[in-house]
């Protein structure tokens, strides 16, 4: 809490310009694996938590990085649809790979989904990921107008 113009205010006022924070949840993507939301909407921005290659019924996808990446994209699409957004509205993508040897194969799937619209992206090799998966992807998007 702090004083502003001699009126006691609570912390949410510090979120200048952000008037609404809304958690997003859909049964068309796997449930959160810990204490977090599948996504959060802040005004017209959608922040999608890292999606891993699990099906909506919470089963791990077996197979190639391509197959796993397709499931991750489907999860992201479903969460964005629930948020009034889509892949075409993505501003930034963060990709985490447990083995950078999978980069080319992952990138071929990525390119299929982003052929004309190319959001900013980072791809990072990491030592490990939750539930021992080899791929995780998080995105920031805007809502459709």
Swiss-Prot record:
It is found in: Mitochondrion matrix. Present with 168000 molecules/cell in log phase SD medium. This is Protein MMF1, mitochondrial. Pfam families: Ribonuc_L-PSP (PF01042). Keywords: Mitochondrion, Transit peptide. Its main location: mitochondrion. GO terms for cellular component: cytosol; mitochondrial matrix; mitochondrion. One of its GO terms (biological process) is mitochondrial translation. Plays a role in the maintenance of mitochondrial DNA. GO terms for molecular function: deaminase activity. Signal peptide: none annotated.
């Amino acid at each position: 809490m702090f004083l502003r113009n001699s009126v006691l205010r609570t912390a949410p006022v510090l979120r200048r310009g952000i008037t609404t924070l809304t958690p997003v949840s859909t049964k068309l993507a796997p449930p959160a694996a810990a204490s977090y939301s599948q996504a959060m909407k802040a005004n017209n921005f959608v922040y999608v938590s890292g999606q891993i290659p699990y099906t909506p019924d919470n089963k791990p996808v077996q197979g190639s990085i391509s197959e796993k990446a397709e499931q991750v994209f489907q999860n992201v699409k479903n969460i964005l649809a629930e948020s009034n957004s889509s892949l075409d509205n993505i501003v930034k993508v963060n990709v985490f790979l447990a083995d950078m040897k999978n980069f080319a194969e992952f990138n071929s799937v990525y390119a299929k989904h982003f052929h004309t619209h190319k959001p900013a992206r980072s791809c990072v090799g990491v030592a490990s990921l939750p539930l021992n998966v080899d791929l995780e992807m998080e995105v920031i998007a805007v809502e459709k107008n």
